[in-house]
């Protein structure tokens, strides 16, 4: 088991292939045997059989080489199931070890010497089988072994085949198999046909599938029988066991293969594609057919065919094998010419073919297998997969290669697998042998040893095709050469990326692709209902990027892949300028040009990424923008779209509004320019609800009782005030929002005042720790509370109604107005005593009022312990009240604050004698808050003006809202 595992890993042979061809077991059974082999003495007779076969397999190097060639062809034709080989013959597992090697070697690869040795071995094994036939009665045919019957069948088949070949000779002359090779090969066919031995049927299946490459579906004859006839002539000593009946069975099988291969051949010649991997089952048959493939390139030049191509004497009978001549997986039409040069005939010559025949299913990506040498270089090295994938991604982005093409041509994986592997590579040590293969391929690709002739297909291979397309399509897209390259690559890359066409065929398909989409392109791009009114624009359309979207999505992707590096910042800047200058919206631009939403367009235009950091998908919008900028008629087309949208919108709006009230054209125009939908515009036309002062008072009193009224309360209020329920709900919502805004303004102002006072108080710098806590507890709170009172008083004329809700409010209001400057006065008095510390918010400024100092000093020590916790509690309480209700919030100035209560008589006596700055006594709340010019300093210069501006702006907005709300007549908002 260990030796077998080593050989399988060394030659990159899968356990599934090994199990099918050598052990006759499933992959799971093989894995179990190799991973956990039982001791010999514990095995049954049947359990020992796989080990006998493995020993026989290891005894000859040719077995390993043959199995490796089968594995290589299986990788080249991944769509083919291995079970296809086992359909024609019943499967059994009791073949002798000699037969195991037979079936492996039947599909051997290698040089001429290897092929000859295989053929000689086949002769010997046929003789062994012939002698063993009496022991296998089931394998002998009951019809007798008449050579004459078989020869007559073979001669008839030969005549039919020569007639077919004569019809194809002008167009095809690939190298046929030599008669000698066919003669040597064919003994395997007839004897193994009647035999049910599994060991010999793969040669039968393979060699039967070899010739069915005749292109004509109607010609249902077999190319093989001539070879069989020659064999029967060349090896007369062999007693052919197959009777007429078995030979007829062989003929029937081969005819069915011929029918399928004829269909495939028509398709192959219709697209002139030499790639075998894209062919359906008959194609797989050809890849399985031959004696072997070359090992070195991991390619698929089969033994007899390769030999025939080297021997000029062989160029005769199997003209249908043309495509099989290319020794490795053909990746482009140039490789088909390689095969053609061997056959001395151009393969691009026109042939009667039916391009209608579709492929049975899309071909899976397939790549040539890696050679053992390539495996050995990297398999046992430690590879940094993260760095490797990073380099691969960079190279893909630099060369504009899509992951799909890279996966199909280099890794043999789907786009999803490639994306997953490149984004989340596993560590090398955690990868299985199969998991390491893609990374080995990536490394070889980076080193230029793999796939270099494949990837340029995307941008360079079809250069002549591009020129022919542009010459054919000069009326189309004359302004933008790059857009002409789009259909080119889409034709080669998108429909059948793994099968590039010849230039003549692709030009034909490209002209169709380029000519057809142009008229419908505008419609598909616009995607708007009023598009039919825009046919004249489609004449001027060709130079715009809009037609690009009319092609397949891949066409723009391929254009992106070939695009040179673009200045994304410059492109977005120009686009923004054009849109702004012409009053075009981003939504219209995004939907019409880029196929994106307004949000995506805004993001692209405001924060464009550098080109090299963008994926292919991310580059697409910038390519579209560039093409749009290059179009001289770009603005006119967008303006037309805008006008059509406007007309459609007005029609919809008119139909929706006509029932209730007529819409006025000017207002509709304004609504459209704002880009709003019909429903919001309809709501904006409703008359504005204006509440009477009595209604406002009643609602405010209700708010003080319950800021969040229940539905029942709302209904009662609406009934009492004769208002709509929705009006009452909206009033409560708006009033709560106003309270929150005022609290926000107060916090901003309090913070700016505290910072200004703390930074510039001379005594603050020399104050001690204990007095600073006292100052913080007192001034900090009042500085936060006093301004709120003044601001609420000044900014809202009806603010007093918020707090008291009764007669008391008249008595409280004057007191509040007088208290507005108190924070400034307190700040001016306090610092004589121990003032707040330098970093405190509630510091004071230099001012008269010396008597305040001793009192502050006396108060300080007794209040120090709880000084810090109280302001925090108060702030939390204040936020709760701001959310829950405005009653206590607005009555806060009346109760004064904790410090005012503690100051006692000293505070009340100091107030009248204090001469505060004149600015602090002004009615304007802003001036009372920010009226101390000496409070501004160098360190505060950066953030204080910004805070002032914010507060002033919010104050002015609220003031205007209050003024507008207090008016009787309905007016529009003015900002």
Curated annotation (Swiss-Prot):
Residues joined by cross-link Glycyl lysine isopeptide (Lys-Gly) (interchain with G-Cter in SUMO2): 229, 255, 286, 724
Ranges in coiled-coil conformation: 113-169
SMART domains named among the record's database cross-references: CUT, HOX
UniProt-annotated stretches for the region Disordered: 90-113, 126-148, 209-246, 262-369, 476-549, 652-687, 752-949
Entries under InterPro entries matching the protein: CUT_dom, HD, Homeobox_CS, Homeodomain-like_sf, Lambda_DNA-bd_dom_sf
Residue ranges, compositional bias (Basic residues): 861-890
Keyword DNA-binding: yes
Subcellular location: Nucleus
GO CC, any one term: nucleus
Name of this protein: Homeobox protein cut-like 1
Origin species: Canis lupus familiaris (Dog)
Organism classification: Eukaryota, Metazoa, Chordata, Craniata, Vertebrata
Gene: CUX1
């Amino acid at each position: 088991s260990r030796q077998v595992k080593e050989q399988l890993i060394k030659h990159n042979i899968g356990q599934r292939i090994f199990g099918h061809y050598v052990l006759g077991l499933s992959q799971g059974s093989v894995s179990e045997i190799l991973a956990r082999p039982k001791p010999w003495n514990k095995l049954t007779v049947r359990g020992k059989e796989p080990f006998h076969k493995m020993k026989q397999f290891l005894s000859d190097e040719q077995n390993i080489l043959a199995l490796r060639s089968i594995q290589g062809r299986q990788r080249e034709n991944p769509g083919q199931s291995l079970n296809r080989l086992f359909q024609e013959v019943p499967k059994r597992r009791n073949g002798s070890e000699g037969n195991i090697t037979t079936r492996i070697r039947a599909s051997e690869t290698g040089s001429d010497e290897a092929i000859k040795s295989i053929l000689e071995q086949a002769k010997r094994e046929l003789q062994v089988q012939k002698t063993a036939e009496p022991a296998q009665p089931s394998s002998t045919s009951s019809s007798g072994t008449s050579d004459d019957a078989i020869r007559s069948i073979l001669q008839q088949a030969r005549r039919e085949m020569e007639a077919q070949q004569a019809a194809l000779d002008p167009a095809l002359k690939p190298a046929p198999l030599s008669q000698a090779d066919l003669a040597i090969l064919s003994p395997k066919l007839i004897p193994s046909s009647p035999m049910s031995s599994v060991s010999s049927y793969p040669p039968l299946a393979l060699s039967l599938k070899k010739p069915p490459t005749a292109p004509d579906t109607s010609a249902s004859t077999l190319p093989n029988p001539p070879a069989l006839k020659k064999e029967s002539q060349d090896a007369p000593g062999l007693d052919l066991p197959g009777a007429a009946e078995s030979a007829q069975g062989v003929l029937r099988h081969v005819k069915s293969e011929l029918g399928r291969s004829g269909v495939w051949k028509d398709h192959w010649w219709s697209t002139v594609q030499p790639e075998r991997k894209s062919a359906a089952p008959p194609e797989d048959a050809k890849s399985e057919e031959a004696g072997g493939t070359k090992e070195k390139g991991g390619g698929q030049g089969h033994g007899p065919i390769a030999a025939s191509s080297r021997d000029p004497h062989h160029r005769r009978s199997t003209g249908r094998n043309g495509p099989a001549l290319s020794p490795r997986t053909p990746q482009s039409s140039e490789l088909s010419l390689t095969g053609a040069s061997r056959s001395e005939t151009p393969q691009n010559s026109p042939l009667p073919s039916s391009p209608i025949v579709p492929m049975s299913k899309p071909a899976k990506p397939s790549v040539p297998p890696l050679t053992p040498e390539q495996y050995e270089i990297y398999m046992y090295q430690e590879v940094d997969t993260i760095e490797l994938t990073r380099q691969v991604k960079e190279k893909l982005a630099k060369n504009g290669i899509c992951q799909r093409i890279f996966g199909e041509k280099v890794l043999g994986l789907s786009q999803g697998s490639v994306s997953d592997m490149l984004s989340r590579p596993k560590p090398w040590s955690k990868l299985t042998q199969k998991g390491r293969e893609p990374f080995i391929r990536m490394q070889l690709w980076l080193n230029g040893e793999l796939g270099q002739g494949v990837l340029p297909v995307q941008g360079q291979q079809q250069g002549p095709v591009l020129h022919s397309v542009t010459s054919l399509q000069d009326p189309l897209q004359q302004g933008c050469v790059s857009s002409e390259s789009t259909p080119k690559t889409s034709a080669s890359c998108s429909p059948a990326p793994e099968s590039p066409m010849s230039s003549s065929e692709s030009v034909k398909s490209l002209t169709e692709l380029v000519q057809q989409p142009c008229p419908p392109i505008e419609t598909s791009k616009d995607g708007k209902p009023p598009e039919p009114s825009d046919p004249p624009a489609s004449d001027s359309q060709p130079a715009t990027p809009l037609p690009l979207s009319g092609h397949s999505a891949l066409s723009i992707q391929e254009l992106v892949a070939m695009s040179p590096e673009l200045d994304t910042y410059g492109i977005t800047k120009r686009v923004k300028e054009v849109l702004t200058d012409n009053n075009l919206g981003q939504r219209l631009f995004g939907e019409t040009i880029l196929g994106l939403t307004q949000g995506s367009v805004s993001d692209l235009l405001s924060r464009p990424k550098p080109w090299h950091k963008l994926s292919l998908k991310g580059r697409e919008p910038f390519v579209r923008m560039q093409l749009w900028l290059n179009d001289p008629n770009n603005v006119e087309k967008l303006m037309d779209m805008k006008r059509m949208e406007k007309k459609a919108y007005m029609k919809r709006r008119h139909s929706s509004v006509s029932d209730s009230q007529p819409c006025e054209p000017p207002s509709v125009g304004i609504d459209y320019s704002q880009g709003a939908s019909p429903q919001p515009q309809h709501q904006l036309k409703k008359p504005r609800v204006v509440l009477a002062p009595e209604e406002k008072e009643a609602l405010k009193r209700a708010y003080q009782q319950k800021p969040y009224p229940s539905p029942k309360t709302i209904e009662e209020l609406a009934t009492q005030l004769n208002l709509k329920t929705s009006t009452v709900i909206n009033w409560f919502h708006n009033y709560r929002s106003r309270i929150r805004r005022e609290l926000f303004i107060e916090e901003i102002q309090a913070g700016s005042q505290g910072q200004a006072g703390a930074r510039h108080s001379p005594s603050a710098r020399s104050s001690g720790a204990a007095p600073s806590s006292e100052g913080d507890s007192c001034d900090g709170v009042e500085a936060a509370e006093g301004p709120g009172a003044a601001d609420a008083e000044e900014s809202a004329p009806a603010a007093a109604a918020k707090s008291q809700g009764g007669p008391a409010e008249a008595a409280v209001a004057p007191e509040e107005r007088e208290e507005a400057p108190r924070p400034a006065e307190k700040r001016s008095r306090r610092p004589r005593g121990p003032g707040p510390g330098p970093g405190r918010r509630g510091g004071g400024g230099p001012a008269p009022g010396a008597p305040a100092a001793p009192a502050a000093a006396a108060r300080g020590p007794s209040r120090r312990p709880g000084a810090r916790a109280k302001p925090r509690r108060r702030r939390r309480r204040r936020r709760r009240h701001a959310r829950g209700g405005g009653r206590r919030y607005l009555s806060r100035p009346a109760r004064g604050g904790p410090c005012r209560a503690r100051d006692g008589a000293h505070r009340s006596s100091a107030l009248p004698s204090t001469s505060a700055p004149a600015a602090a006594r002004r009615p304007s709340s802003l001036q009372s808050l920010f009226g101390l010019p000496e409070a501004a300093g160098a360190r505060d210069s950066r953030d204080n003006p910004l805070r002032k501006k914010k507060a002033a702006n919010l104050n002015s907005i609220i003031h205007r809202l209050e003024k507008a709300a207090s008016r009787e007549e309905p007016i529009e908002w003015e900002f």
